[in-house]
Design a protein with these regions (language model features):
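Short His-Asn-centered micro-motif
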Residues: 21-24, 45-46, 99
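Inter-motif core of Ras-like GTPase G domains
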Residues: 34-46
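C-terminal accessory "lid"/substrate-recognition subdomains
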Residues: 12-14, 18, 35, 49-186
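Phosphate-binding/switch loop-helix module in NTP-utilizing enzymes
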Residues: 1-30
Length: 186
């Protein structure tokens, strides 16, 4: 598919335990549609804005050959959609993983390198009620993820290199529970 194209709709086979969707619009909500309401679990994975722009600039230049000026024009042109359609989805998610660099990214338009996971923290935020709904034990997570800490009653911070491990610790039991509950209903 070309950038900006959607994959075609497909039927989900009977007996499917889990449908995993990855993309920009998993929690989109608007006039006449509410994709967020169809999901049992919404997980957001998003870098802080300047990091997102650095990644876009590097990717679009390396993979598509776009000039820095053309990429900045694209970012500016898409800003209303970003503000009105992308960002609000993260208010719908149960859990957000947000990567925040610990190196200077104050001007994303001149950054030479994309900060590595080890040059970042990941803020893991749980929407109000999500910890209780999914049985998330902050004490367990803090014990299991070295150097993690709570930054608020609803957020844990981990080293960027530990994001995959944190996702595994958090999401695996949730998915198992979802399948168990589905099996009880059938």
């Amino acid at each position: 598919l070309e950038p900006g194209q959607f994959t075609p709709w497909e039927d989900i086979p009977t007996g499917t335990d889990v449908l995993f969707y990855e993309g920009l619009h998993g929690g989109v909500k608007g006039e006449g549609y509410d994709v967020a309401a169809l999901a049992d679990l919404l997980v957001g994975v998003v870098p802080i804005t300047n990091l997102e722009w650095i990644q876009k600039i590097h990717r679009d230049n390396a993979e598509r050959g776009y000039s820095a000026e053309a990429i900045v024009d694209t970012i500016l042109r898409r800003m209303p959609d970003y503000i009105n359609h992308i960002c609000p989805q993260f208010s719908q998610t149960d859990i957000n993983f947000q990567r925040v660099p610990t190196v200077d990214t104050s001007n994303p338009f001149i950054c030479r390198n994309i900060p590595t996971p080890d040059e970042s923290f990941v803020i893991i935020h749980f929407r109000k009620g999500a910890r209780e709904k999914w049985g998330i034990d902050f004490g367990y997570l803090l014990n299991m993820i070295h150097d993690s800490f709570m930054s608020s009653p609803t957020s844990i911070v981990v080293n960027g290199g530990k994001m995959g491990f944190a996702m595994e610790l958090i999401l695996t039991p949730i998915i198992h529970r979802m399948i168990e509950e589905k099996n009880k209903l059938s």
